[in-house]
């Protein structure tokens, strides 16, 4: 702890954000990094706690508290305060393969568990992480380090999202020969097509993938395992196979009129925008994407993906945006039964919601509401949506609280475009069937508790395909742990340290 009184001397300083009305004019990241001197002062705010909850990564009441990767947050905060940015990078990389991703898209579980935030503002650890990794690229610390000795073992990774990339990176460093198969045209999975450009500019994915290629990893795109290439041939060619295909099967909304033209899954909407931008020099060309321009948009789902749909719709030039959320509004401050260091279950306004409020003059969200019916015109196009209010009721059989319709509360709103962001149900069935792996009741690939090997010999799994829809940081952790288990199965021992 370089400055014992740092948390008292310095206030938290956030990276300045471009104003909502200005940033919706482009698809670039919109936060301006602090200067190195300012960021060093932010590092001084870290209290170097005897028990640093920020790196605990524990589940409390079903929610994560602290970093699942067990990032050495107090260490690299102290190092940047002392100006030792290179060593800070090495301490960061010890636990996190991809800080260039997490420092942009992670909800900062570390900050929610920060002791400094118990009675004040948390240490800006996410921004510190961003500065460490970007400085490392600028100074050359993050350059490729090719492996010098190979084991002769070959591993296939199916899927190039964060878990697949983490598995590949760890096993390649160990000396195994790794090939990553991706069904899309570019590497990245969720990072590439599930997260909009203004949250994660795609050149940062390419920057890291290029380094991984220099280090010896082979990437094969436009190859859909289970369709374009048979599972049997993969198993014959490789010593081990890791399934990291994500939880890509979207949850649908079953309501009358669902077949109306103008209803899309959120991931298809976001993906079409990203592809159109990169095909046309970061400009949207009419007819090349699912457009919200001039339309009344309804987003179904109150999570991060729903917010991304709002932000993307605002950049398209939507006429109006309404976000429909089934659950009640969370409290503005922690409830007594939600104490620190639990994840704070409070109402938060994210960037897309902030942008819609700035343009339209009101919060786009409506709570305790769901779709009753999609209404079509004579041509089959969506023109309106009937919504209905909900209330929590206790199920007498299970004891669980369920959201039930309130009779007589139906109302109709205009809608030209509906985006379904209601989460994901699990992995793609054709992949699991191709390899013959068992799935659980949630259609996630089944493994013994705390392990990553499936019921099929030599086949492993990790990430959302294994644990269900989750955060990038959890996917990276699963990839690291799976790599360690795979290494043991190949070599009989491991020298990997994944925590």
Region spans (language model):
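Short cysteine clusters
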Residues: 46-49, 54-58, 63, 67, ...
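Glycine-rich dinucleotide-binding loop and its adjacent helix/turn
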Residues: 131-149, 207-228, 250-316, 439-455
